[in-house]
Amino acid sequence: MDYLQQGLERFKQEHGSEVPPQRRQAGAPRPVPPPIVYTSTKTVELTDETMRTQRLITGFEGGAFVDAFKMLRTQVVKQCRQNGWNVLGVTSPTPHEGKTLTAVNLSLALAMDLAHTVLLVDADMHRPAVHQAFGMDSCPGLTEHLFDEVPLEQLLIHPGIGRFVFLPGGRVIANSAEALASPKMAVLVEELKHRYPARLLVFDLPPLLSRADVLGFVPHIDALLL
């Protein structure tokens, strides 16, 4: 066994005492990223009452409603890890089926996993509603970035919930399908994908059957949750 001990000592001298990530035991805990300090991102603190009124899972300690989104998170994270995905779209066949609430609460559930930061983008440019889910009035967002060149740093909002940030939809536009399929939107998605390696991107998209927006945007995402 001496040769094994000698080999181990030689490995430590060459590489340090830490075992490479690929040789960690499968059950070893993943490293937790340091906490994020939001300096340039606008922060809005939500009260517990607001979170409960808006049916955000962070306003409840438990129950079937919260558990359902945690189960969905487990399935989504599993698929993302297996396939190397980090860009998800959330849609519904028709309006008023709860897609925005699903996108918001899935994003919050994902942000509870300390291995990830989550950015939710309101890409329903015909009927933006993510800001309403946080009890906020209309505010500039994706539209202003694409058409008015407002920097993202001035548009992102951190609602005081963990490692979660969202980009509002901004003002309503008529040519939303063209905007989502535009080269500028493609550049934005690529930038957001690569700016933070541990970040998951979630896009709240328009209903699938009522507009052409989703079909033009699908090439930019890894998976679509219907």
Predicted features, each with a name:
Residues 1-226:
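P-loop NTP-binding module
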